[in-house]
A protein has these predicted regions:
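A short acidic/glycine-rich loop-to-helix N-cap element
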Residues: 143-148
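GNAT-family acyltransferases
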Residues: 2-142, 153-189
């Protein structure tokens, strides 16, 4: 799958990882994929950016109740009162973290990038027993459909093929969020 993905080399430091003790969660020479086609569809993944706010906000807020059920207990996201400006600042933070290789948020987009249809998050481990934590969602109208099924197949294959993890954890997939929250914190050593 690596040949399907273009890559981008990071260009600045890893401040969050230093603060959390995960300075070396990725190899120094790791180049993250910048475009990942979703097989059998016209959809693709790419790193989200601040300029995507006008696409992201309706996707998130249009699926907010379900997303809160999934991510709310762990991340307190997305808040009911989130404004477009708060979303813009959140996407700016994601864009900066991606560039620094602190964490990754990939938008699921249609072919012409006119709509965000979901996201994939790839993060350093917060809980013991993994070297990367991965979660994803699709907008409400795609739940249970072909696009969600394709993403469910793609993400673990893509992580195995293109990411340097030996023990990735798929939150909400191979472990419930409740069980994940009960795990001890990851060691910072």
């Amino acid at each position: 799958m690596g040949d399907l993905c273009e890559s981008l080399v990071p260009d600045y430091g890893y401040q969050l990882a230093v603060a959390s003790g995960f300075m070396n969660w990725l190899p120094d020479d790791f180049a993250h994929p910048v475009r990942v086609p979703v097989p059998g569809s016209a959809l693709h993944l790419r790193p989200i950016k601040e300029a995507d706010t006008a696409l992201d906000y309706p996707a998130v807020m249009g699926s907010r109740e379900r997303l809160w059920e999934i991510f709310g207990p762990a991340w307190a996201w997305p808040p009911e009162t989130m404004t477009i400006e708060e979303d813009r600042l959140d996407l700016r933070r994601h864009e900066e973290e991606i560039a620094a290789h602190q964490s990754f948020n990939y938008a699921l987009l249609d072919e012409k990038e006119t709509e965000i249809l979901g996201c994939v998050y790839i993060d350093p481990p917060e809980r013991a027993g993994a070297d990367g934590e991965v979660s994803w969602w699709v907008v409400d109208r795609l739940v249970g459909g072909e696009a969600e099924r394709a993403l469910d197949v793609l993400v673990p294959q893509w992580i195995a093929a293109d990411w340097p993890f030996r023990q990735p954890r798929y939150l909400g997939r191979d472990i419930t969020w409740q069980d994940w929250l009960a795990l001890p914190p990851a060691s910072s050593s």
